[in-house]
Design a protein with these regions (language model features):
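Extended catalytic core of nucleotide-activated donor transferases of GT-like folds
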Residues: 15, 20-28, 32, 37-125
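Nucleotide-activated donor-dependent transferases that construct or modify glycoconjugates
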Residues: 1-15
């Protein structure tokens, strides 16, 4: 299975995020025979602007996701902690590739309303 895993891999942390959940999930999927393309949303958003800020580069990172999906044609898009990702991107993915499944993982507590709002925005997809 081809999987696009969109999460916060912390590529700019020089190995400090070696044991983070997103890396463990990707490693487990690879060990089970899947091809996994890791997309570090926050790092890519920072690269998308001269000011190196996530918020200003989020639009660019969202466009990059669509380019990757067009090249990779994944069977599964797995999303974790990509709080600046646009739900519109998922809508476009489902329109272009209706067979592609979209899954979401989250490890933060759900008693905070802004966390629930984020999850609700993605739930239709």
């Amino acid at each position: 299975m081809k999987i696009l895993h969109i999460a916060n891999f912390g590529f700019n942390k020089q190995g400090a995020h070696f044991y983070c959940t997103d890396r463990k999930i990707s490693a487990g999927l690879v060990e089970n025979g899947h091809f996994v393309y890791d997309f570090s949303f926050r790092d890519m958003a920072r690269m998308g602007t001269i000011f190196k800020t996530k918020k200003l580069g989020a639009s660019w990172a969202n466009k990059e996701i669509l380019k990757i999906v067009n090249n990779l044609e994944p069977d599964l898009v797995l999303i974790g902690h990509s709080d600046l990702m646009s739900p519109e991107v998922l809508k476009q993915i489902k329109q272009q590739y209706p067979e592609t499944k979209i899954a979401f993982w989250y490890v933060d507590p759900l008693y905070l309303e802004h966390k629930l709002d984020f999850i609700r925005a993605f739930s239709p997809y």
